[in-house]
């Protein structure tokens, strides 16, 4: 059976719309003709990767020489080569995200919030007086194995399967099929074992990214709070319901907790942004984002007269799904964005895209700094902006 290869490419700014197909399927990156050592599958994967990078990659000119490593006659590791040739500047990796995979099902499930998981999000810490580690639970997905045994935010994990946590076994907390956790507790400024153990079996489940939503009365005004962990497609309509509720409750400000949100689909990003923007901005169809592609594609779009702006709107569509967000415009005057190193991509985009039009105050540490979006391309060619 021939594997289907799937290539994720990142492009400057944060919204992908239409594109062009490449007329010359022969591509480049051909070998010297001294002899072919690759299988048909690997030959195709190299050629596919070269053609896609040569058409869509933002830094295609900067990595033109490196792309020759995707010689289909001799390169036996196209997946590794794509990672190796990603754009760098002064030997520092600028593009940390472009990747190629032959496991499309797992990648799509991950984007759609489906995972084989224990259902917790963990932060790793290290003891100052030893080489051992510990975990602190950041949050737990409702209905997950971790949720069912009572694990909650702030809990401490000190052992995995009866052993201290080290650099050699810490990944078992995430990537095993079952595990026994030795729980910890804090006493007198120190962390130690509590004596409690919990055993979990991983399950395949949808991880609902809407972690918490509630309204507080603060000094005579109503303030909403939304903790959100991923801009997946299934949560878009749920966000509309939540914003309708916030509107009904009369909130004037919103605490938007994106500390653990690494991004997701542009479609869902737009749904949320267009409901949080001032109503007059939405009705005036002001510019929300502008796409920047590589030089060749920018010239192509210019010749076609394509508009590369995304405008605020009361309707959000991605071609297959349309959501009316006009009724859910919350009417808030300020957003407090809770951010950290796990805040990336669509999360950063929402906050930055709203800043010209309303008060947005950022609270927390530095965000991840992923100022790019991506398209997914597979065979047969299918592009999904996220």
Regions found by a protein language model. Give the residues of each.
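Positively charged n-region of N-terminal signal peptides that target proteins for export
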Residues: 1-4
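Surface-exposed patches in mature extracellular/periplasmic domains of secreted proteins
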Residues: 59-70, 258, 283-291, 325-328, ...
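Flexible, low-complexity junctional segments that flank or bridge functional domains
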Residues: 21-254, 262, 268, 278-281, ...
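Gly/Ser/Thr-rich loop/hinge elements
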Residues: 266-334, 376
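Short, well-structured beta-strand/strand-turn elements
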Residues: 342-344, 357-371
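Single conserved hydrophobic/aromatic residue that forms the stacking wall/gate
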Residues: 376-386
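Sec-dependent N-terminal signal peptides
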Residues: 6-11
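C-terminal motif of bacterial Sec signal peptides marking the signal peptidase cleavage site
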Residues: 16-19
